[in-house]
């Protein structure tokens, strides 16, 4: 394809007019575009305008435009690919009417490195290669985290004021903050389209639970006590349960909050209604946590919706067939993932298993917090039978440490092991702070150093050692031996035996 060019005007006497040449530019897939170029101008002056003209003509023809690939430059080349000199004109390089040229992108073969003039520039240059820079998504998440931190700190300040002053300031101020933060969280959740947007909304939603709890707890008049605890923890547990139900995310966090606040609400209600003693409340909480440690796998399975298979009955029903509502046959669609024919699919089973893992992790974290608080509160150095809660704490820590080996997920095993270690550390620190004697401080300091050292030694030796079945059975019996005295010691601590004896 050629373009028709006007004939150059005849030169006037005494005046030299610039020459023009009509050349064919090869561009795209077999496309030739005729253009009129100045024969006396340097090639470098005409390259960029020529590229724009060629791309506009390619768009008119429906062809793909010329795009730069990486670092380099555009150049006019002869038909054999040799580039023309950029500083010379077409006439100087023997290019005349009717010649064909080729405009192409020549990659830059030179390696360029950043010039480092100061040590600070070198540090910044190396760090930019190893770490990602702040993008808008991360900036929004950091801002949401700062807002959430400020809301939680403001809730703490308002709660401190309510602890010392019986006024309505805390209730009104915390209610306004809670309404504003929760409204923003709901708007973000409704408009969220990506995981980053949902993460920001979840941060705002979790932080909004703090002022809501403070507002509810400070509403009852009078000094802070069990009525305020019942209302505050009750509202927090209900709000966390609703967030868990309607968002379907952050299952472990909301499950831990519901576990802690639900049991604390029941204990506060017992204290408010029946004036239950602190020892009875903490000992009962300890026993409930031990029972829930055994029931947590089954509870998490039920919460996730996983149904157990039906075992054959004595009448031989379902011996050679599965339950009617369970999938039995694997079907693979064209280009799709394998699914099970029936109401459940492979993806549903994987999703339910992940939900069960999140529920179980939240339960273990919540129960661990309650165990640490209960055992630390029971171990009072000034009681007459101080050895009794110490034995209870020791057996409970041993049970938790050995119980962690039965979990497949390593984070769940770590949660139980950390709970056992924190129980021992918290009880020891309380004894050192309350007794304030050189002997107690020396013993506690030695214990706080030797206990992690023993744990590190066990972590280095146990995974690399193969144990016999007899030794494994011995460890299992040791776990049962640590579990057996917990209930009798707790009943003894609550004076249940004395009440039965003198009844």
From Swiss-Prot:
It is found in: Cell inner membrane. Its main location: membrane. Pfam families: EccD, YukD. The chain crosses the membrane at residues 137-157, 169-189, 200-220, 224-244, 250-270, 272-292, 359-379, 414-434, 443-463, 480-500. Belongs to the EccD/Snm4 family. Part of the ESX-5 / type VII secretion system (T7SS), which is composed of cytosolic and membrane components. The ESX-5 membrane complex is composed of EccB5, EccC5, EccD5 and EccE5. InterPro entries: EccD_transm (IPR044049), T7SS_EccD (IPR006707), YukD-like (IPR024962). Keywords: Cell inner membrane, Cell membrane, Membrane, Transmembrane, Transmembrane helix, Transport. GO terms for cellular component: plasma membrane. This is ESX-5 secretion system protein EccD5. Part of the ESX-5 specialized secretion system, which is responsible for the secretion of EsxN and a number of PE_PGRS and PPE proteins. This component is essential for ESX-5 complex stability and secretion. It is a multi-pass membrane protein. The gene is eccD5. It comes from the Bacteria. The lineage of its organism: Bacteria, Bacillati, Actinomycetota, Actinomycetes, Mycobacteriales.
């Amino acid at each position: 394809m050629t373009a028709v060019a006007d004939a150059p005007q005849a030169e006037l006497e005494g005046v030299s007019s610039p020459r023009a040449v009509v050349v064919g530019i090869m561009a795209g897939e077999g496309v030739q575009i005729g253009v009129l170029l100045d024969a006396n101008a340097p090639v470098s002056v005409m390259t960029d305008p020529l590229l724009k003209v060629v791309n506009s003509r390619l768009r008119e023809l429906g062809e793909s435009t010329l795009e730069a690939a990486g670092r380099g430059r555009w150049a006019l080349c002869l038909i054999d690919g040799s580039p023309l000199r950029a500083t010379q004109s077409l006439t100087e390089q023997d290019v005349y009417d009717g010649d064909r040229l080729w405009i192409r992108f020549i990659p830059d073969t030179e390696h360029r490195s950043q010039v480092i003039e100061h040590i600070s520039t070198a540090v910044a240059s190396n760090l930019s290669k190893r770490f990602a820079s702040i993008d808008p998504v991360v900036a929004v998440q950091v801002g949401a985290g700062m807002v959430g931190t400020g809301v939680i700190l403001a809730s703490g300040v308002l709660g401190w004021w309510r602890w010392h002053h019986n006024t309505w300031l805390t209730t009104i101020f915390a209610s306004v903050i809670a309404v504003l933060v929760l409204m923003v969280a709901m708007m973000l959740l409704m408009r969220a389209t990506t995981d980053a947007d949902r993460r920001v909304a979840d941060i705002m939603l979790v932080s909004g639970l703090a002022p809501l709890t403070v507002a509810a707890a400070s509403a009852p008049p009078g000094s802070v006590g069990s009525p305020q605890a019942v209302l505050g923890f009750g509202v927090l547990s209900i709000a966390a349960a609703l967030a868990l139900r309607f968002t379907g995310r952050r299952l472990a966090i909301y499950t831990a909050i519901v576990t802690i606040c639900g049991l604390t609400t029941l204990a506060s209600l017992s204290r408010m209604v029946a004036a239950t003693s602190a020892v009875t409340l903490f000992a009962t909480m300890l026993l409930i946590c031990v029972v829930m440690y055994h029931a947590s796998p089954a509870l998490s399975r039920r919460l996730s919706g996983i149904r157990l298979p039906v075992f054959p009955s004595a009448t031989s029903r379902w011996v050679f067939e599965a339950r009617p509502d369970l999938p039995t046959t694997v079907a693979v669609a064209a280009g799709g993932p394998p699914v099970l024919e029936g109401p459940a699919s492979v993806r549903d089973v994987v999703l339910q298993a992940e939900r069960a893992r999140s529920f179980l992790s939240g339960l273990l974290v919540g129960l661990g917090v309650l165990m640490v608080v209960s055992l630390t509160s029971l171990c009072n150095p000034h009681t007459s039978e101080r050895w009794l809660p110490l034995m209870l704490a020791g057996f409970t820590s041993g049970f938790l440490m050995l119980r962690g080996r039965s979990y497949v997920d390593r984070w769940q095993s770590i949660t139980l092991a950390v709970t056992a270690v924190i129980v021992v550390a918290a009880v020891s620190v309380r004894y050192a702070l309350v007794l304030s004697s050189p002997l107690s401080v020396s013993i506690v300091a030695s214990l706080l150093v030797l206990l992690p050292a023993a744990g590190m030694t066990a972590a280095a030796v146990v995974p690399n050692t193969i144990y016999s079945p007899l030794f494994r059975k011995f460890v299992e019996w040791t776990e049962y031996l640590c579990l057996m005295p917990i209930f009798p010691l707790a009943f003894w601590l609550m004076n249940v035996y004395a009440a039965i004896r003198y009844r």
